[in-house]
Amino acid sequence: MEVNFVTNRIEIAPTTRHEGHAKLILEVDEEGIVNKAYYLNTTPVRGFETMLKGKPAEFAPIAVMRICGICQTTHGIASCEAIENAIDCEVPDDGLLLRELVGIGNRLHSHPLHHLLTIDDFLKPDETDLKIELIKLIQRMRKVGQLVVDIVGGEGIHPPNIVIGGMRTNITERAKSRLYYALRQYEKDAYELYEKYTELIERYLEEIGIPDLGAHEYPYIATHTTYGDRYAINWDDVTEIPAQRYYDDEEAKQTTTIQIPLYAGVPAEGGPRARMVKFGNFREGGSAMDINIARAQENLGAVYRALEILDELDLNGKTRAEVEYKDGFGIGVHEAPRATNTHMAEVGKDGKIKSYRIIAASTWNFPIVEKAIEGYPQQYAEVIMRAYDICASCATHVIVKDEETKEIIEVRKML
């Protein structure tokens, strides 16, 4: 941590226990309260949107799954959904069920990974036995999530069964039985983790004496509990602006590698709490630590839905539609573990990508993290940040410049 005592400016670089590379710049008053926060993505831009132009549409889901090794499944699903929407391709019911299931598997792995990265925020140094117990519990859960992706998706890291038109293949009766048994064990572990993890968070808030730590007044964005719904968002209200136009701080303008999505002109929180508020009875507007609790609750809802899918799935059902390309523009939405993940594709009748846009899940939460930190003591800034389970690799974005002036020029309306 670097402190400038003249300007009361604190830099935490890098921030830790999340995916990717980022840093926090905090402007604090004499009492250490954060007046202004900048949460800056320092992960290099890879340029996936530009890379896809002119490529065969089938390459898109394969490529975008390489954006991130944790969020690969959600990118593959959102990409396929966007292209299918562009060409009016209707995925068979069993293909959609399998696609939802593989996405849930990703969540069943990703959420516990976040719990693993955050337990040190709430455990005391002498609680070694409890820490070991929780780690073992979490690792069992992660293995089940990866098992679901491996069996349904065909591979645990970049699942090849997620294809345009649906899913490449169905699962067998033996695979179904194996998944059912594993998910039943996950259900027990998830409930145990929820109880113990929630107790730790509630104790932490009581001990620091800030029950509303990280609270903010910004809206939530979510489209579905376990899949995604492109019609749940008014796309006329979604804009994406360069960070250079969003920030008033020169270092922030020059450092961050994201663009800022806004909903109705303001930042919006996505992710577990947003989904639980929109589609459940979760409390609204509380501490950022509520996001950790909502994430633990989502483990339970996700595993229940996974078991339902196994009951609904026809193992002899068709899982993939015929694909015929035509000129079109489509939107694909999937509720990633961290927030709403959106891919937009313009496709030609030759089956090639004309243009491609991505608003990855964590992109929504970068500006929200800043708002959540402001007004609270600086020593809790990373704890608040970690509650959002940021994936910095996903949030990196293309930078659009004027070829002559080299100035950032683009403000993107989504439609």
Swiss-Prot record:
Belongs to the [NiFe]/[NiFeSe] hydrogenase large subunit family. Heterocomplex of the form (alpha(1)beta(1)gamma(1))(8). There are 12-13 Fe atoms/(alpha(1)beta(1)gamma(1)) unit of the FRH. SUPFAM superfamilies: HydB/Nqo4-like. It catalyses: oxidized coenzyme F420-(gamma-L-Glu)(n) + H2 + H(+) = reduced coenzyme F420-(gamma-L-Glu)(n). Pfam families: NiFeSe_Hases (PF00374). PANTHER family: COENZYME F420 HYDROGENASE SUBUNIT ALPHA, COENZYME F420 HYDROGENASE, SUBUNIT ALPHA. The keyword Flavoprotein applies. Ni(2+) binds at C68, C71, C391, C394. This is Coenzyme F420 hydrogenase subunit alpha. Reduces the physiological low-potential two-electron acceptor coenzyme F420, and the artificial one-electron acceptor methylviologen. Gene3D superfamilies: Cytochrome-c3 Hydrogenase, chain B. GO terms for molecular function: coenzyme F420 hydrogenase activity; ferredoxin hydrogenase activity; flavin adenine dinucleotide binding; iron-sulfur cluster binding; nickel cation binding. InterPro entries: Coenz_F420_hydrogenase_asu (IPR017682), Ni-dep_hyd_lsu (IPR001501), Ni-dep_hyd_lsu_Ni_BS (IPR018194), NiFe-Hase_large (IPR029014). Keywords: FAD, Flavoprotein, Metal-binding, Nickel, Oxidoreductase.
